[in-house]
């Protein structure tokens, strides 16, 4: 196994971890605080997720000898940001994370549930995701309106670097954010001391509680979004690169690591979609049989980044929240545009997808349940009625 290691896979692994962490950690923090986490709990959740996905990547790639890339659920974090605090607060959200992990395990081991997830029309799943992401993608505009001197550098860095390489667009925006905070924000007394103290990793256990509203508003939509937007595309990327793993055990393993991270604030661990292509492609290594080391190296780097989560969260908290939300919004624009296109491409499902999108994007909940769930229900009913009428005709 050690003979398969290469410097090329080392550099690619570190790059994968940097891109994966830097491009979406802001979304994770925004999502966790959106469902009631305080700063310490959000830092703990970020650390738990990063370490869990790192260990998961190392374990899976070592056992299978396949370049399986692992990530946290960025669309799932975006869903959390739009869900709001449910009855029971963050404890209830953690209970929902546990249920989501259990559902992912069942989907991997029990094929009927996996088939049910696969039976959800892709147009509706994408419309729900696009509806969740819409309000978050407004954040860059709001940041510019809040303070052009702070917001514009972040957006311009993303746009200029993105015109050359989409891969580095969000990391460039993140660097601009760091410079804005360091040079433009008045640091409170003791800020540097606080950053130094935050370098010591601190996991915070959150006792889970369970409520019907949290299960329906968070657990079910999080499970659907994670499976439809991360796990299933992750398998597809591997197949495109001529790797053919059994999906079930991979899904179940990510579900297990979701269960392990949830009590410390982590929402979902899953197969990666974007960085999966980096792991499995020829840039990872010319020899297909040796590319799995890129995933192992990425896993090691994720663990290191996870140990720095407290310092990252403390630094982010020094700036107005709208600025880090702008970075998160920029990170989600690509996901929003691809989801919107996929939702409205098929004429047969377009109207039902529009209903799903609008109900979800409205952010309006009923009976303590978020709009994401009701959007999927409304779109599903619309599609069923349309197909029923067409069948009778």
Map each language-model feature to its residues:
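Helix-loop-helix hairpins and the membrane-proximal interhelical loops
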Residues: 1-43, 171-247
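Membrane-embedded helical hairpins/re-entrant loop segments and their flanking transmembrane helices
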Residues: 2-6, 30-59, 220-292
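Short, amphipathic, aromatic/basic-enriched membrane-interface segments that mark the entry/exit
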Residues: 13-16, 38-44, 61-67, 117-123, ...
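Transmembrane alpha-helix interface/packing and boundary motifs in multi-pass membrane proteins
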Residues: 16-18, 56-68, 257-267, 363-367
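Membrane helical hairpin/interfacial module
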Residues: 40-42, 48, 56-113
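Short, non-helical or kinked segments that cap or interrupt transmembrane helices
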Residues: 64-77, 117-125, 244-250, 267-276, ...
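Interfacial segments of multi-pass membrane proteins
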Residues: 79-86, 158-161, 276-290, 294
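Membrane-embedded alpha-helical modules
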Residues: 87-191, 297-393
């Amino acid at each position: 196994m050690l003979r398969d290691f290469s410097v090329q896979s080392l550099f690619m692994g570190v790059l994968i971890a940097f891109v994966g962490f830097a491009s979406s950690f802001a979304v994770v923090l925004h999502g966790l605080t959106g469902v009631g986490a305080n700063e310490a709990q959000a830092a703990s959740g970020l650390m738990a997720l990063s370490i869990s996905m790192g260990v998961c990547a190392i374990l899976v790639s070592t056992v299978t000898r396949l370049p399986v890339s692992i990530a946290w659920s960025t669309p799932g974090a975006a869903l959390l940001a739009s869900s709001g605090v449910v009855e029971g607060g963050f404890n209830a959200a953690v209970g929902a994370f546990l249920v989501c992990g259990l559902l992912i395990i069942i989907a991997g081991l029990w094929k009927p549930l996996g088939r049910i997830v696969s039976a959800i029309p892709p147009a509706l799943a994408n419309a729900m995701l696009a509806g969740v992401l819409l309000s978050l993608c407004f954040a860059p505009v709001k940041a510019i309106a809040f303070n052009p001197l702070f917001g514009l550098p972040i957006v311009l860095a993303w746009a200029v670097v993105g015109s050359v390489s989409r891969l580095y667009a969000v990391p460039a925006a993140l660097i601009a954010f760091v410079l804005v905070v360091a040079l433009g924000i008045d640091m409170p007394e003791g800020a540097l001391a606080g950053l130094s103290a935050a370098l010591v990793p601190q996991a915070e256990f959150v006792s889970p509680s369970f409520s019907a509203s949290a299960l329906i508003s968070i657990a079910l939509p999080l499970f659907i979004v994670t499976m439809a937007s991360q796990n299933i595309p992750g398998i597809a990327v591997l197949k495109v690169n001529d790797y053919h793993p059994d999906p079930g055990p991979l899904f179940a393993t990510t579900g297990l690591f979701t269960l392990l991270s949830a009590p410390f604030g982590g929402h979902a661990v899953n197969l990666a979609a974007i960085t999966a292509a980096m792991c499995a492609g020829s840039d990872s290594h010319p020899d297909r049989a040796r590319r799995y080391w890129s995933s192992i190296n990425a896993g090691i780097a994720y663990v290191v980044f996870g140990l720095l989560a407290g310092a990252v969260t403390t630094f982010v908290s020094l700036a107005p929240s709208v600025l880090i939300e702008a970075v998160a919004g920029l990170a989600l624009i690509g996901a929003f545009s691809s989801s919107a296109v996929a939702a409205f491409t098929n004429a047969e499902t377009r109207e039902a997808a529009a209903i799903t999108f609008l109900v979800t994007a409205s952010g309006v909940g009923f009976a303590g349940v978020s709009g994401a769930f009701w959007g999927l229900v409304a779109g599903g009913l619309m599609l069923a009625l349309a197909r029923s009428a067409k069948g009778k005709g």
